[in-house]
Swiss-Prot record:
InterPro entries with a match to the protein in the record: NAD(P)-bd_dom_sf, SDR_fam
Keywords noted in UniProt: Oxidoreductase
Enzyme class: oxidoreductase
Superkingdom of origin: Bacteria
Organism: Staphylococcus epidermidis (strain ATCC 35984 / DSM 28319 / BCRC 17069 / CCUG 31568 / BM 3577 / RP62A)
Active site: residue positions: 152 (proton acceptor)
CDD domains for this protein: SDR_c
Family indicated by similarity: Belongs to the short-chain dehydrogenases/reductases (SDR) family.
Protein name: Uncharacterized oxidoreductase SERP2049
Length: 230
């Protein structure tokens, strides 16, 4: 079984919600953590709570130069990377007939382009060392959109497609890639959302799924994990 201990994990969107939970879980498993996000103060607070070495990098995933600079800082500090978790995301309820183009642009920039920026920066290092694991946070909305999340669902469908294609590209390179697709998760991003009678997941449930994917034997790749409340 693969181990997380002593690995270096880059986690985007680490200042709250799912990203924060993943960062803390990986630290509990013994990984050194790179906390990436825009809220530097909050990232520093989280870093103080970790039991393993941590580096805070204030960066916006939608700005390619920010991510390039982040990777240089990480390599200078730790010397290598092993795990990349793309958990930065934006979820805004918006019907097509709301015509809220600015919200659409934000979700496309963060959810799709942000993920691609991180991939283009980190993949060369992972491929050079012939090892590593990329975790992309998708969503059940990517294949079960509702009438109020068409664009969000489309961005997460894109993450499914990117992950599935990348898995084929990376075959026999030693680098694995997994997409995690949660149902509704109780996080600051969904605060104010009316869950109705629907049950919801906790961010910790997603963090547990990430560890499951990362700790499979070397010959096993978990391509897709779908998590729903019961």
């Amino acid at each position: 079984m693969a181990k997380v201990k002593e690995k270096v994990a880059v986690v985007t969107g680490a200042s709250s919600g799912i990203g924060e939970a993943i960062a803390k879980k990986l630290s509990q498993q013994g990984a050194s953590i790179v906390l990436v996000g825009r809220n530097e103060q909050r990232l520093n607070e989280i870093a103080q709570q970790l039991n393993t070495p941590a580096k805070v990098v204030s960066a916006d995933v939608t700005v390619k130069s920010n991510i390039d600079d982040m990777l240089k800082a990480v390599i200078d500090h730790f010397g290598h990377i092993d795990i990349v978790v793309n958990s930065a995301g934006q979820s805004l309820s918006s019907k097509i007939t709301d015509y809220n183009v600015e919200q659409w642009d934000t979700m496309i920039d963060v959810n799709i382009k942000g993920t691609l920026h991180v991939l283009q920066a980190t993949l060369p290092y992972l491929l050079k060392q012939s090892s590593g694991h990329i975790i992309n946070l998708a969503s059940v909305s990517g294949f079960e959109p509702t009438k109020t999340n068409a664009v969000y669902g489309a961005t997460k469908a894109a993450i499914h497609a990117i992950t599935q294609s990348l898995e084929k590209e990376l075959a026999r390179t030693g680098v694995k890639v997994t997409s995690i697709s949660p149902g509704m998760v109780d996080t600051p991003m969904t605060e104010g959302t009316d869950f109705g009678e629907r049950k919801k997941l906790e961010a910790q449930n997603i963090a547990d799924a990430v560890v499951y994917a990362l700790t499979q034997p070397s010959h096993v790749n978990v391509n897709e994990v779908t998590i729903r409340p019961v």
